[in-house]
């Protein structure tokens, strides 16, 4: 497997990096508070950390849902967090023209699951030279991810991460088939597990996505035990009042406990997997 290096963070090595933060940038102060707390926890546990938050939630269920403050304001906040806490940052893009602007700030460009087959978007992200993290679509077989990887490689980029976030099962349900982790790893790149979006129930509510937060630990520990190379998790300090994905963001006051368990499961996998 190709190891993907990001400063002093290595995806595909023995340590299991953590990508986390609030689903959407709600405000500068809120993001700073979350970044500070996660930095404290991950430093204590010696877990490599990449801060994540979105400047625009472009695929909200309802047109009236909060989307964020937009590209310019969002990138300014992400840049401040990056410099203030000396941590790498990531965000997602939705249009090819976002790629160059975002690449001036972030260390990883994330491609949303719904857009994972959009060739122009993949090419634009790849051509920045940044690490590109593609979230596998809910509609996509893990075997088809090889086509996504080919698009990125043919665009000159081999700094690739793939994120598993479950597959649509019937109406309004997601199921994670953990065979997808080694299947996608077989294409040569690290695979991240999205612990929070995998717990979603799309369309569970009329105007917003629901979810089963209580199953996040079970699925996460199973994914780590299946060899996941990193964990993606959206976290919040007031989950019930979060402005996006309130049903599945993980409470920040429970983050240290779940990360401690992740470390233990990772050690067991490395020793016996």
Residue ranges and their predicted role:
Residues 1-18, 76, 267-273:
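N-terminal amphipathic alpha-helix/helix-capping segment at the start of soluble metabolic enzymes
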Residues 7-24, 54-64, 190-205:
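N-terminal small/glycine-rich loop or linker at the start of catalytic domains
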Residues 15-19, 46-52, 86-90, 107-108, ...:
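Structural preference for beta-strand elements that scaffold enzyme active sites
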Residues 22-31, 49-71, 236-246:
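Glycine-rich, proline-tolerant flexible connector loops at the mouths of alpha/beta enzymes
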Residues 36-40, 44-45, 64-90, 125-131, ...:
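Alpha-helix-loop-beta-strand connector modules within alpha/beta enzyme cores
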Residues 63-72, 85, 110-115, 171-175, ...:
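Active-site-adjacent loop and "lid" segments of alpha/beta metabolic enzymes
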Residues 69-70, 84-98, 107-120, 131-142, ...:
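Catalytic beta/alpha-barrel core
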Residues 129, 133-235:
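Catalytic alpha/beta core domains of metabolic enzymes, predominantly
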